Amino acid sequence: MKYIEVDEELYRLIASKTERIGESASEILRRLLGLEVEASATQEKDEPEVISQPGLEETADVEDKPRFIDLHSSINKEELAAAKGAVGRFLFILEAVYLASPEQFAQVLKIKGRDRLYFATSKQSLLKASKSANPKEIGQSGYWVTTNNNTAKKRTILTEVLHQYGTVEAQIESITRNI
């Protein structure tokens, strides 16, 4: 792997073209330049095979399916507009998601970058993963999120959260535009 130095404007442009969490700069540039992206870099890790256990099949199906929650109606537009900056709006929306279904929120802990931790249950966990994480608590949820990402990355992270909640694409776009 070779390293190159790029100016801030170019870095922001590349970062804004991120399509999924964990996508490397090389993958972004390869995609933008129309070059072949290495298969190993884009493929998800294989999940372990689920072994059927009599009497538990129905429970497993229920847990795997995200429960649809209409988050659009649970976000107070006036309070969102009053939130300070992109970080404030990001935290406000995450708190609204949490309040809509607190028992389902733990799944955000699965959202991670290639070398980055985005959510944790303590400030220390995020700081241990990255000294520059600038962790903030999501309301009074007991969950913490890294906030030193650019706005495009915050939107990508929020998109992943909303996907986990079974939110439809049109709502995801509408909600993430508010950051």
Swiss-Prot record:
Going by the entry's taxonomy, the superkingdom of the source organism is recorded as Bacteria
Q: From the UniProt record, give one GO term of the biological process aspect.
A: regulation of DNA-templated transcription
Q: Which GO terms describe its molecular function?
A: DNA binding
Q: Provide GO CC annotations from the record.
A: cytoplasm
User: What is the source species?
Assistant: Shewanella woodyi (strain ATCC 51908 / MS32)
Quaternary data:
Homodimer. Polymerizes to form helical filaments.
What job does the chain carry out?
Answer: Negative regulator of replication initiation, which contributes to regulation of DNA replication and ensures that replication initiation occurs exactly once per chromosome per cell cycle. Binds to pairs of hemimethylated GATC sequences in the oriC region, thus preventing assembly of replication proteins and re-initiation at newly replicated origins. Repression is relieved when the region becomes fully methylated.
State what protein this is by name: Negative modulator of initiation of replication
